[in-house]
């Protein structure tokens, strides 16, 4: 397991731990879950239901389920190999071998065009001596490519979610206009029909199952 040899290394580790919330949000499946659920709430037209705590809580739970194999594999490595912060070689070995399952997860869910973009842009933006040293599976490439890929997929799913609800809004709006009820808000009338459609289609089950299965393979 990781050893903390002295106070200085402890301070360094604690400082790095402050980055964990950012990594947990942007470098895991959480980002796609959270964006899709937010788009669903907007499509339904209910800005406060479900509340943020419930929505993000569900995203966290599903992300823990999806990311669990990566965590288990990393834990197995730490149990089988001693990682000391005073030993640079052991730290480098951990980043090379211990994080291999995580890098594999990122690779499996990166769109090819995003990966190619960040590989090519590195050669243009970074100084040559640093760009030449950068490996193709470096986290400097995988993390931004993964995040952009996840956001792209989330918005694609959000677009498909929006379509049936927009149709309901248009139908209700036209009916109200035909009845001369221009002062009545179409959103107020269409909301029950949106909820009914979502419930009849077993929306939560289909959506969550589809999102989880998208990380298969």
Swiss-Prot record:
Lineage: Bacteria, Pseudomonadati, Pseudomonadota, Gammaproteobacteria, Enterobacterales
Disulfide bonds listed in the record: none
Underlying gene: yscR
Task of the protein: Component of the yop secretion machinery. May have a role in the negative pathway regulation of yop expression controlled by calcium.
GO cellular component: plasma membrane
Membrane-crossing residue ranges in chain numbering: 11-31, 53-73, 157-177, 181-201
Family: Belongs to the FliP/MopC/SpaP family.
Annotated protein name in UniProt: Yop proteins translocation protein R
Single Gene Ontology BP annotation: bacterial-type flagellum assembly
Keywords attached to this entry: Cell membrane, Membrane, Plasmid, Transmembrane, Transmembrane helix, Virulence
Membrane topology: Multi-pass membrane protein
Native organism: Yersinia pestis
Places the protein is found: Cell membrane
